[in-house]
Curated annotation (Swiss-Prot):
Domain of life: Bacteria
Protein's gene: ribA
Pathway: Cofactor biosynthesis; riboflavin biosynthesis; 5-amino-6-(D-ribitylamino)uracil from GTP: step 1/4
Active site, UniProt feature: D126, R128
UniProt-listed Enzyme Commission number(s): 3.5.4.25
Keyword hit for Nucleotide-binding: yes
Enzyme class, spelled out: hydrolase
One Pfam family linked to the record: GTP_cyclohydro2
Protein name as it appears in the record: GTP cyclohydrolase-2
Length: 205
């Protein structure tokens, strides 16, 4: 996987001063970022998150998803721990891109759920490729994670790459009336582990 390290710098945030590592995927031209804090190459499991880019949630305060809230909660958790890593992956819209995500939102406004909308546009429900994470984690010396996620697919992807997931740390945050059925669909159709709150809430056709 031709993902190469480019540069690193300090990144002060309201939570902590992280080190920001920049990587380039030469195959796609996409630029990815890793935020790290503390000694993450000591062989001990590292509190971490794989966070896919979500412009609407991360930067524009959208309540259609829980992404922005999860990003903030993950960075806060790493800051409290004093040690951790967050991979910010440029895989907008579960891998379909920003404009296609807006097209999917338009279909959702008409009644489709998040999975149906992607499929009507000719995409899989989730097109993300987590193989890009391996060279970044190897560069940083991370071999084991306490992974902050509700998505079992991320756990499997890391395990398949021989990155040990020592623990899955749930991230239950950002729930609101606007994303209730979105979260229910992720639980019912994508297998996300969101507890009982959203199980069985997808409206039946």
């Amino acid at each position: 996987m031709p993902v190469v390290f480019v540069a690193a710098s300090k990144l002060p945030t309201p939570f902590a001063t992280f080190t920001m590592h920049g990587f380039l995927d030469e195959a796609t031209g996409r630029e990815h970022v890793v935020l790290s804090l503390g000694d993450i190459a000591d062989g001990e499991p590292v509190l971490g998150r794989l966070h896919s880019e979500c412009l609407t949630g991360d930067a524009l305060f959208s309540q259609r998803c829980d992404c922005g809230s999860q990003l903030e909660a993950a960075l806060q958790a790493i800051a409290r721990e004093g040690r951790g890593v967050l991979l910010y992956l440029r895989q907008e819209g579960r891998g379909i891109g920003l404009l296609n995500k807006i097209r999917a939102y338009e279909l959702q406004d008409g009644g489709a759920d998040t999975v149906e909308a992607n499929e009507r546009l000719g995409f899989a429900a989730d097109q993300r490729d987590y193989a890009i994470c391996l060279p970044m984690l190897e560069h940083l010396g991370v071999k084991s994670l306490r992974l902050m996620t509700n998505n079992p697919r991320k756990v499997k992807a890391l395990t398949d790459m021989n990155i040990k997931v020592a623990e899955r740390v749930p991230l239950h945050t950002g729930h609101n009336p606007h994303n209730r059925y979105y979260l229910a669909t992720k639980a019912d159709k994508l297998g996300h582990m969101l507890g009982n709150e959203h199980q069985g809430e997808v409206p039946q056709a």
